[in-house]
Amino acid sequence: MGQTITTPLSLTLEHWRDVQCIASNQSVDVKRRRWVTFCSVEWPSFDVGWPLDGTFNLDIILQVKSKVFCPGPHGHPDQVPYIVTWEALAYHPPPWVKPFVSPKPFPLSTLPFSPPGPSAHPPSRSDLYTALIPSIKTKPPKSRVLPTNGGPLIDLLTENPPNLGEQGPPLPKGPVKKRRPPPPRYSPPGPMVSRLRGNRDPPAADSTTSRAFPLRLGGNGQLQYWPFSSSDLYNWKNNNPSFSEDPGKLTALIESVLTTHQPTWDDCQQLLGTLLTGEEKQRVLLEARKAVRGNDGRPTQLPNEVNSAFPLERPDWDYTTPEGRNHLVLYRQLLLAGLQNAGRSPTNLAKVKGITQGPSESPSAFLERLKEAYRRYTPYDPEDPGQETNVSMSFIWQSAPDIGRKLERLEDLKSKTLGDLVREAEKIFNKRETPEEREERIRRETEEKEERRRAEDEQREKERDRRRHREMSKFLATVVTGQRQDRQGGERRRPQLDKDQCAYCKEKGHWAKDCPKKPRGPRGPRPQTSLLTLGD
């Protein structure tokens, strides 16, 4: 009552600081949340027997590792640090892991034969490690069929089968004593150019689990060669763009191969010859030799120092010695620097200006594309503080129109850092209307526009009707007035006169003022009009 079951996953979480230290010793970094996700969700889906609570079984760990390291689109590079740390916990278990780790099988030749003893007592229910203690059942003794004369046994893994036509000596009569067969012999591979790995113990003879991981290590404690498989090289070449098309992606692939496989000098040449063209390879090697630094830490052009650090001919580096491994580490670092420098195209600012933010692209993703364009098409490093102003201006001008306009109107824009601009752009981007909201707004604006147009049409029609009504009213008024005048006789119009016709006598030759028939006497006084008064 009250006890909790301890599992490998919960145990690692309880000792998380130790796990991080072990990961740091492996030159990797692990996160707690992703550790739990990979252990309980991702790796059980590989169908190699990984339990949801984790395990320290090396066979299962190695099969998961083979899935993680699978080249091409089926691999999981993001899970490499985590499975490598699990493997380190199983190979070199700390004290808190040892109770969960099954003891390594001893060589069969050193195990003395003993008859099966009585069954051990069953574990109690309160034991926290009951899952790790195998149940031992009493088995009936088997018939002994092997001879007791110490005759040689044939190792079917290393020896040829006997001739069926020959018959061996007759078996002696009497009780037969059982003997164990000798352990299988593991012949180390030949000196083939390939990856470097430390040796591990050979698999147990009774193990039926197949290890899909291609790197098997001997038990002599020496580093051995294991070649790149042709399928690996084929997948790497066909599943990735060429170096000229996308140098960044191919450089990232080669960097992961250099980190995880630790290739030798010959391996690197094979890798470059497969993934690069001849011209690309020469450019990479030239840039790598330029990156060699002297004792003062500055780039050097001394042939002896350059050839010592990055030789073009096959060196005699012994990978089994610390000095040889240090040479290989430096060579791989210089090769990676050469890939990065050779991947830069000639300066082309037009390519940088052509990088614009997509309609649904986040500002962070757009900034990464912009920085990649700076690295690829310019000699400038976008992470350099001296180039922050140029990158910021490009970020503002080449952002989406709505984001760029609002960024330009920010107060105190000169004091804003690139990080501040990205945060402001993220706020603007997150406040954008959704496609549904945009469709609704467009529909609403269209309806309002149609309503305004309809109202304007109605207003124009009413104005046209009023104007037509006024004109019709004037016309009708004129017609009615003319008809009324016709009924009343109308006004008598004066007859038309000629230019020299008198208006008084109607004779021609003089005007009315000179008409002799017109009386000339003074006019009589007009009679005064009498006004009525109050007295009248």
From Swiss-Prot:
SUPFAM superfamilies: Retroviral matrix proteins, Retrovirus capsid protein, N-terminal core domain, Retrovirus zinc finger-like domains. Residues 139-216, 432-536 are annotated as: Disordered. Residues 436-474 form a coiled coil. A lipid is attached at G2 (N-myristoyl glycine). GO terms for molecular function: RNA binding; structural constituent of virion; zinc ion binding. Keywords: Capsid protein, Coiled coil, Host cell membrane, Host membrane, Lipoprotein, Membrane, Metal-binding, Myristate, Phosphoprotein, RNA-binding, Viral matrix protein, Viral nucleoprotein, Virion, Zinc, Zinc-finger. It comes from the Viruses. Residues 432-464, 484-517 have a biased composition (Basic and acidic residues). The record marks Y129, T130, F213, P214, L476, A477 as: Cleavage. A zinc finger (CCHC-type) spans 500-517. A motif (PPXY motif) lies at residues 183-186. One of its GO terms (biological process) is virion assembly. This is Gag polyprotein.
